[in-house]
Design a protein with these regions (language model features):
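Glycine-rich phosphate/ribose-binding loops and adjacent secondary-structure elements
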Residues: 115-290, 294
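Short, well-ordered coil↔helix boundary/capping segments
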Residues: 293-304
Length: 348
């Protein structure tokens, strides 16, 4: 909350609510770092929202104060430890975007840049982070709301996963690959750091199968799922590699709001609030260019198309009504090294 404009937030909320209420499509929206709009917290539509808590804890005073007034529980709590686009870095909201509302929700002065630490400062080990923080958040909602960590894809993913398998309160693990998006990061982080999501999610799933926990800890894959416009095909492949669900960000902004950024070129004004489309601006002169109803309509159209294409991919496998999680025998690739790395078929 703070990175996206009020009109973008409203459009996404409307679209997600329609997908769930009218179409019965299980799409959820994550707040990202920084809290949640106060009106949404006290709305019944909060049940379609995943509340994210990150190392800066921005916005969580507002959330805790709203707890007694919440009409519904949130869908889940996501504890962000890392982001695929910038492993090892914390979040950053530039001062250009910290207006009076953002400042009030985040509990900070207006017009001040808000960096988050690269780690959760109150925890000093993976064991504490996994066990104590997850348990604390789980207890806060009376053990009704699942809690899971989000990490950037790295070579230490399995170390985190092994700790989760011993934690009875862990609701899953979200892994964010190197192609994930961000509104503010160093170029060196975005261009030269990170780990591919496909091999990382595969390693995690195979690790779970070895210990018989593949049906207990769901894995969620993110980071470049919509790359090159192949959303359904990439999502299906990751599900067959072991993911129980996928997360998208950049693709939704491009499809629903006409984001000018692309895989080969960046607009480069997300972080300073001068987005010409009004997607990532807190300036009323810019965000009023964005019609939330049109954003909602296009978001619904995008997910309907995604659903149709995903069914076309999955139906020939005889799994038209359920996801083929870990069904890697349906995958093939013409790259022998990649086939060996992912333990899937090599086809020529």
């Amino acid at each position: 909350f703070g990175a996206l404009s009020p009109t973008m937030w409203e459009g996404l909320q409307m679209g997600v609510a329609y997908l769930n209420e009218e179409l019965g499509m299980p799409v959820r929206m994550c707040t990202g770092e920084g809290g949640c709009p106060p009106r949404l917290l006290r709305s019944r539509f909060i049940k379609y929202v995943i509340l994210q808590i990150a190392s800066g804890y921005f916005g969580w005073d507002e959330i805790i104060h709203a707890l007694p007034e919440m009409k519904e529980d949130p869908c889940a709590i996501e504890i962000k430890y890392g982001q695929g686009a910038k492993p090892g870095d914390g979040g950053l909201l530039m001062w250009y975007k910290v207006n009076s509302l953002i400042a009030r929700v985040r509990g900070v002065p207006a017009g001040v840049s808000l960096p988050s630490p690269p780690t959760h400062q109150t925890k000093y080990s993976i064991e504490e982070s996994v066990a104590k923080m997850i348990q604390s958040m789980y207890m806060a909602w009376g053990f009704r709301v699942p809690v899971y960590p989000k990490i950037s894809a790295t070579s230490t993913t399995n170390a985190v996963l092994n700790n989760l398998t011993r934690n009875p309160y862990a609701g899953g693990l979200a892994i964010d690959g190197e192609d994930g998006g961000t509104g503010a990061a160093y170029n060196v982080s975005m261009d030269h750091m990170g780990y591919p999501i496909a091999s990382n999610i595969r390693d995690a799933y195979l690790n779970l199968t070895k210990i018989g926990k593949q049906n207990e800890i769901p894995l969620f894959a993110g980071g470049g799922i919509g790359k090159n416009g192949n959303l359904a095909a990439n999502a299906a492949a990751l599900i067959m590699l072991g993911a129980s669900g996928v997360q998208i960000g950049k693709y939704a902004m491009q499809a629903a709001a006409g984001c000018l950024g692309s895989e080969t070129d960046r607009c480069n004004v997300c972080n300073i609030g001068l987005c010409p489309k009004g997607i990532t601006s807190q300036d009323p002169r810019l965000y009023r260019r964005l019609d939330p109803e049109k954003v909602a309509e296009r978001l619904v159209d995008m997910y309907l198309s995604f659903d149709t294409e995903l069914k076309k991919v999955v139906a020939p496998l005889g799994r038209s009504t359920s996801l083929p999680i870990g069904m890697s025998d349906a995958l093939g690739i013409a790259d022998k090294s990649a086939a060996e790395r992912l333990q899937i078929q090599y086809v020529v």
